[in-house]
C-alpha cells in the first residue's frame, strides 16, 4: 500500500512537471554546484571549496593528486539539507582512507525541486563533475584510475553522466540504490551504466515496484549488481520495525532505499566482518541455496571491498543480511532427501533445523522451500542463514512441527481423519537419512548422518539428530567411473591371461 502511494505521488509530480516546463528551465540556470573538500569529520564545519580554474584552491585545500580522490554525490531531497547518512558516509570514508581527497558534491539547490526537474538536472551536474576532473588532470596530472565516485539514488546517475563526459576513464563508480523512476529501461547513455568507469558496482535495496514505478532501479546496470535480501524487504525496515522508532510511513520507504548507504558504510567500518554476495540468475534460485559457489569468481565482497571481475557485465549477485550493523551473516546450502515410506495422505511437513557449531548454536530455523512444500522422495535444497558465526558445524537437529490449534491445522487434521478413519494407523512417517551442507563463506562441505540407521523415522512433533559423518560430499559420478573401470578390467582379464600363456609357450620353445 505504501509503495503504491509513493509511486502515485511520483507519477503526479511528472504530470505537474509537464505543465510547468518553463519554470524547470529557469531553475536549472539558477542552481549552483559546489565541491566541498572535507578537512574534518564534522560536516558542520565548512570545509574547503574546490573551484574549476582557481589553482590557489588546490593548495589551500591540500589536494593531493597522488592519493585516492573520492567524490560523494547525494540524490533528490525534499528538506534542502544533507541527510544524516551523508555525515556517516563521509566519516567512514575518511576513517578508512585517511590520505584520500574526500569531496562532497553539493547540488542541493538543484535537487530540492519536483522529482522530474531534479532528474533533468542530473546531466548538468554530471558534466560539472567531469569538468572538475578534467581540470584536475590538467593542473595536477590526477590519474583517473584513482578516482572513485559514490552516488546515492539520483546521485548514482549523476556519477554516470560524469563518467560519460570526462576525458578518459574513471577508476570506479559505486551506485547506491540508483533511482528507478524515469531511468528504468532508459538507454545506457541516459543513466548509470557499466561503460561509465573501469569498474561499476551497484547495490540494489529497494526494487519493489507498484504502478510501473520502483523507487530503486530494478534492472542490472553495472559490472556487478548486488541485490541484498533479493533487492527489497530489508530486515528491520518493515512497517512494525520502522513505526516503533519513527512513526512516519515515509520512513519505511527511506529505510529500504537508504539501506544501500548503510551497507556501504558497514563495509568501510567492519573490514574484518565482510559480507559476501553470490552470483545467481535470480532471487528464487538463490533462495534454494544452489548459488553458493565461489568458483570462477562467482562470489564477491560487497560495498567498498568489492573487487572487479574480468569480462563480467551486469552480473547479478545476492546475499542475505542482518537487520543492523554489522550486516554480514553466514549462508549455508542444505540438501535433504526425504522419503515417504508409508505413502501417507499428504503429510505436508513443516521442518525446522537447529545448527550446533564449534563456537555456538542457533535456535530453530524454518526450512524455507519453494512454494512452502517439502518434496517427498526427492532432494530438497534450501538456504539457511545465521546471524552469528557458529564455527564449523558439528551437529544438526531436524524437527517436524507438530499440529497446532490453528483452524488450518484443525481442518487438515479433520481431512486426514475422514480419509483414513484411523489416525493412529495413518500417522505420517518420513525418513531422512542424511543432510549435505555447504558453507558459503568458507566453501567447506560436510555430510551429516543419522547415527543409528534404524532410527531414521520422523513424525509430527518429533525430531532427528544428525551428526557429521564425513567431510565433503559423496561423489557418485566417481563411483560409477570406478565401477566402469572394474567391469572393463574383468572383461579384459581373459585376453590378458591368454596373451600371457602364449608368451610363456614361446619362451619355452626358444629355450629348447
Where are these regions (language model features)?
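Flexible, membrane-associating and regulatory peripheral segments of lipid-active enzymes
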Residues: 2-104, 110-121, 131-144, 168, ...
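The feature captures the conserved acid-bearing segment of alpha/beta-hydrolase catalytic domains
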Residues: 170-171, 177-234
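Glycine-rich nucleophile elbow surrounding the catalytic serine of serine-hydrolase chemistry
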Residues: 150-161
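Alpha/beta-hydrolase fold nucleophile elbow
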Residues: 142-152
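Short, well-ordered amphipathic alpha-helical segments that serve as non-catalytic structural scaffolds
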Residues: 128-133, 200
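The conserved beta1-alpha1 loop
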Residues: 73-77, 152, 177
Amino acid at each position: 500500500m505504501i509503495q503504491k502511494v509513493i509511486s502515485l505521488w511520483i507519477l503526479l509530480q511528472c504530470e505537474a512537471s509537464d505543465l510547468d516546463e518553463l519554470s524547470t528551465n529557469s531553475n536549472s540556470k539558477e542552481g549552483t554546484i559546489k565541491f566541498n573538500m572535507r578537512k574534518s569529520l564534522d560536516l558542520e564545519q565548512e570545509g574547503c571549496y574546490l573551484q574549476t580554474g582557481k589553482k590557489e584552491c588546490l593548495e589551500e585545500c591540500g589536494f593531493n593528486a597522488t592519493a585516492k580522490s573520492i567524490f560523494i554525490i547525494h540524490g533528490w531531497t525534499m528538506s534542502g539539507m544533507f541527510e544524516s547518512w551523508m555525515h556517516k558516509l563521509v566519516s567512514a570514508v575518511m576513517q578508512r582512507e585517511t590520505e584520500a581527497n574526500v569531496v562532497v558534491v553539493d547540488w542541493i539547490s538543484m535537487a530540492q525541486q519536483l522529482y522530474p526537474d531534479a532528474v533533468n538536472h542530473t546531466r548538468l551536474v554530471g558534466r560539472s563533475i567531469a569538468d572538475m576532473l578534467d581540470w584536475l588532470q590538467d593542473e595536477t596530472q590526477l590519474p583517473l584510475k584513482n578516482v572513485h565516485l559514490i552516488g546515492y539514488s539520483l546521485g548514482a546517475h549523476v556519477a554516470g553522466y560524469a563518467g560519460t563526459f570526462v576525458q578518459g576513464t574513471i577508476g570506479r563508480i559505486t551506485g547506491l540504490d540508483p533511482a528507478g523512476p524515469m531511468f528504468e529501461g532508459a538507454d545506457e547513455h541516459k543513466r548509470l551504466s557499466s561503460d561509465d568507469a573501469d569498474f561499476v558496482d551497484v547495490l540494489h535495496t529497494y526494487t519493489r515496484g507498484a504502478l510501473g514505478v520502483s523507487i530503486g532501479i530494478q534492472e542490472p546496470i553495472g559490472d556487478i549488481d548486488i541485490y541484498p535480501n533479493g533487492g527489497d524487504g530489508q530486515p528491520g525496515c518493515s512497517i512494525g520495525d520502522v513505526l516503533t522508532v519513527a512513526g512516519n510511513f515515509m520512513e519505511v520507504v527511506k529505510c529500504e532505499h537508504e539501506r544501500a548507504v548503510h551497507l556501504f558504510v558497514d563495509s568501510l567500518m567492519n573490514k574484518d566482518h565482510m559480507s559476501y554476495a553470490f552470483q545467481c540468475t535470480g532471487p528464487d534460485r538463490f533462495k534454494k541455496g544452489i548459488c553458493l559457489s565461489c568458483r570462477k569468481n562467482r562470489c564477491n565482497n560487497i560495498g567498498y571491498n568489492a573487487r572487479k571481475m574480468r569480462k563480467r557485465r551486469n552480473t547479478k549477485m545476492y546475499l542475505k543480511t542482518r537487520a543492523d550493523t554489522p550486516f554480514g551473516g553466514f549462508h549455508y546450502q542444505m540438501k535433504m532427501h526425504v522419503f515417504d515410506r508409508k505413502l501417507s495422505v499428504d503429510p505436508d511437513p513443516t521442518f525446522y533445523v537447529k545448527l550446533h557449531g564449534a563456537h555456538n548454536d542457533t535456535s530453530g530455523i524454518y526450512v524455507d522451500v519453494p512454494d512452502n512444500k517439502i518434496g517427498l522422495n526427492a532432494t530438497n535444497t534450501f538456504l539457511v542463514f545465521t546471524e552469528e558465526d557458529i564455527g564449523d558445524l558439528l551437529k544438526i537437529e531436524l524437527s517436524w512441527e507438530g499440529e497446532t490449534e490453528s483452524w488450518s491445522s484443525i481442518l487438515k487434521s479433520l481431512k486426514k481423519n475422514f480419509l483414513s478413519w484411523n489416525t493412529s494407523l495413518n500417522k505420517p512417517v518420513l525418513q531422512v537419512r542424511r543432510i549435505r551442507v555447504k558453507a558459503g563463506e568458507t566453501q567447506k562441505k560436510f555430510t551429516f548422518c543419522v547415527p543409528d540407521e534404524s532410527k531414521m523415522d520422523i513424525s509430527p512433533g518429533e525430531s532427528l539428530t544428525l551428526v557429521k559423518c564425513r567431510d565433503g560430499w559423496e561423489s557418485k559420478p566417481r563411483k560409477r567411473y570406478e565401477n566402469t573401470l572394474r567391469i572393463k578390467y574383468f572383461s579384459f582379464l581373459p585376453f590378458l591371461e591368454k596373451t600371457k600363456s602364449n608368451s610363456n609357450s614361446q619362451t619355452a620353445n626358444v629355450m629348447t
